[in-house]
Amino acid sequence: MSRYRGPRLRIVRRLGDLPGLTRKSARRAYPPGQHGQNRKKRSEYAIRLEEKQKLRLNYGLTEKQLLRYVRRARRVTGSTGQVLLQLLEMRLDNTVFRLGMAPTIPAARQLVNHGHVTVNGRVVNIASYQCRPGEEIAVRDKAPSRKLVENNLQYPGLANLPSHLEFDKNKLVGKVNSVIEREWVALQVNELLVVEYYSRQA
């Protein structure tokens, strides 16, 4: 399954706010479609599926990519759900988004893919790159790159910088100080239900 490229507000109305996908909020509180307001009681499977979809769409992943992350999380000591969120949050595209360099994760991915971002002084154009504590994330020292990010900083996707990051707006340089803590994950999701969803596949 490929990444979702359809109407974003339609997804937000169905799943709730997805801060990584879009800054817009749904004006209608019920799901889209003719029968959106007449929702039947959902099965446990449907609830787990919805949480999985939230995670996949917010971080802009394909089904295969998310499954790989679940498998990686299972191999790490600790809560699989929490490790899964940390792996997703520490991706380079998400880190660029959380630093305020881009208004959404898709926009951050584009910055990375087009070579506008450096890690420890070297251009990294792989959005899935895992950022580590101590690494410096910066805007490439080129006029087009700086202009893009300076424009984005005027309209950040999220207001608060998470505690594991720091950012110098004048130099356009950020630093990863630690791995993100659960309370700073912006997406409202039950990660345990996501792990349960994949329990037979991972």
From Swiss-Prot:
InterPro entries xref list? Ribosomal_uS4, Ribosomal_uS4_bac-type, Ribosomal_uS4_CS, Ribosomal_uS4_N, S4_RNA-bd, S4_RNA-bd_sf
Annotated S4 RNA-binding domain residues:
90-152
Region (Disordered) residue spans: 22-43
Q: Which SMART domains match?
A: Ribosomal_S4, S4
Q: Which GO molecular function, any one, fits this protein according to its record?
A: structural constituent of ribosome
GO term, biological process aspect, one: translation
Task: Output a single Gene Ontology CC term carried by this record.
Answer: small ribosomal subunit
Q: Where are the transmembrane segments?
A: none
Asked if the Swiss-Prot or TrEMBL record annotates the protein with the keyword Ribosomal protein, the reply is yes
What CDD domains has UniProt attached to this entry? Answer: S4 (cd00165)
Q: Which domain of life is it from?
A: Bacteria
Q: Keywords assigned by UniProt?
A: Ribonucleoprotein, Ribosomal protein, RNA-binding, rRNA-binding
Tell me the protein family, please: Belongs to the universal ribosomal protein uS4 family.
Quaternary state and partners of this protein? Part of the 30S ribosomal subunit. Contacts protein S5. The interaction surface between S4 and S5 is involved in control of translational fidelity.
- Spell out the HAMAP family in the cross-references: Ribosomal_uS4_B (MF_01306_B)
Summary of the function given for this chain in its UniProt record: One of the primary rRNA binding proteins, it binds directly to 16S rRNA where it nucleates assembly of the body of the 30S subunit. With S5 and S12 plays an important role in translational accuracy.
What this protein is called in its record is: Small ribosomal subunit protein uS4
Organism, by scientific name, is Nostoc sp. (strain PCC 7120 / SAG 25.82 / UTEX 2576)
